[in-house]
A protein has these predicted regions:
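Conserved acidic, metal-coordinating active-site core of Asp-based
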Residues: 105-135
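Short loop/turn elements that form and flank the Walker-type P-loop nucleotide-binding site
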Residues: 2-3, 36
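Short glycine-rich anion-binding loops that position phosphate/pyrophosphate groups of nucleotides
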Residues: 14, 71, 126
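Generic detector of short, well-ordered, non-transmembrane alpha-helical segments enriched
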Residues: 9, 61-63, 117
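Glycine/Thr-rich phosphate-binding loops of Rossmann-like dinucleotide-binding domains
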Residues: 17, 75, 129
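Active-site phosphate-binding/coordination module
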Residues: 20-111
């Protein structure tokens, strides 16, 4: 036990390309790494997105995963901490007004994304990329 090293990794842009899934080649290498070391993950993404990116096998092999920048913490499938903060209605109205009055015309949907302990706001949005819908 004394020789086990502890490592902390970000997910987006470190273990995976931003907002994409882990590559099959790197999956094999990193899974083995999690078998031999104590691995912790810290990410701004929620648990669902993190599971999509790195797979349940790697996620559950990590000692602890800090989702939503530490506001939603898991050890395997067990939620060990969740920040109960909620977006105040006045702030949500302000963000909606900013969205409504913005002159930026390109919109992808999912502009106000509530997460444990945080909110993600984007005029562009985090919905489907318009280029994905083109044929």
């Amino acid at each position: 036990m004394g020789n086990v090293k502890k490592f902390i990794f970000d997910v987006d842009g470190t273990l995976t390309p931003s907002r994409k899934k882990i590559t099959p080649e790197f999956f094999d290498e990193f899974f083995q790494f999690t078998e031999e070391n104590d691995v912790y993950l810290v990410t701004g993404s929620d648990r669902g997105k993190t599971l999509e990116q790195i797979t349940p096998e790697i996620y559950n092999n990590c000692k602890r995963v800090y989702n939503c920048s530490g506001s939603d913490v898991y050890e395997g499938d067990k939620n060990v901490y969740r920040d109960d903060w909620e977006l105040p209605a006045a702030v949500e109205r302000f963000l909606q007004d900013e969205l409504d009055f913005s002159q930026f015309t390109l919109r992808n949907g999912n502009h106000i994304e509530r997460r444990p302990g945080a909110v993600n706001f984007s005029i562009l949005g985090r919905g489907k990329d318009p280029s994905e819908g083109r044929e």
